Curated annotation (Swiss-Prot):
CDD domains: NAT_SF. The keyword Transcription does not apply. GO terms for biological process: mycothiol biosynthetic process. One of its GO terms (molecular function) is mycothiol synthase activity. 1D-myo-inositol 2-(L-cysteinylamino)-2-deoxy-alpha-D-glucopyranoside binds at residues 33, 210, 249, 261, 299. It comes from the Bacteria. This is Mycothiol acetyltransferase.
Amino acid sequence: MITTTALVPARRSAVRTLLATVTEHDGVSPLDEAALLALDGEDARHLLLTADGAATDTHAAEATAGSAASADPADPADPAAPADPADPADETLLGYVSVLGDGTVQGMVDPAHRRRGHGSALLRAALALRPDAGVWVHGALEGSLAFLTDAGLTETRRLLTLRRDLGGAQPLPSAPAPTLEGLRLDTFEESRDAEAWVAVNVRAFADHPEQGALTRADLEQRLAQPWFDAEDMLVALRDETLVGFVWIKREQPGATDRDAEIYVVATDPSVQGHRVAGHLMATVLERLERDGVPGVELYVEADNAPALRLYENWGFEVSGRDVQLRATERG
């Protein structure tokens, strides 16, 4: 089995081409933002299934392909682990799985090559690398859930997508004024706010496995994305101390004809209960509505009842589901 933590350009392009094919067929992307960002990094393992029928864990040298069945997977933290040494432009990619450093797994198989055991081969390879893997099914697709359940995995987490229309047909509710003195909203400035933003984010999402683990490097990676627009990132400052923030994501910066996403909204635990989050939400929703954006969506854990009630009061309704499953522990 071939392994690497760094995809060469041709394979990276092949993964993105397969992603477009699968997304169009299934109606939902099988990879989330973290997996997409990992295509350009070196913090994940990439399992590929090519037309020769071999599941390819791209972390060891190409020359080890013939001994895949007996070879131990390379240590992803081993600095001597080689990068993908070839640029196989003539390969046909049938399937792909991303294994992130936190154990998150997500993947896809070409619709034209399903029900041939490819998904099972990729799943076995991923679980061999990370027996504790959390495997995502984006869109909670019935066939994918059945496949993983039959393989012995059980649901452990559910993420909901909520959406609401913007415009006169569904007026925005009025938000009570915040109860903190000296509070003001301002546009995010990296040199001033980045460190405090990360610190507040860690505290606000202490129990969230992905968001709470965000580092300064992770923030900078997202600030460098084409969709980032500083005008869509607001911070709440109390006497110049950052105590909250809201971040809007538009796939095309400045676009007004497509839905926007509440990428993240949070307040420092020390000011929770002072209506700061509601003030941030009201501000960005009113701005998006003025811009003529047709709708807005956000993501929330299905078991977060207080957040669900809050967003329902804001007019949001469930529009999608993502499910994470894990292998059942054997006694």
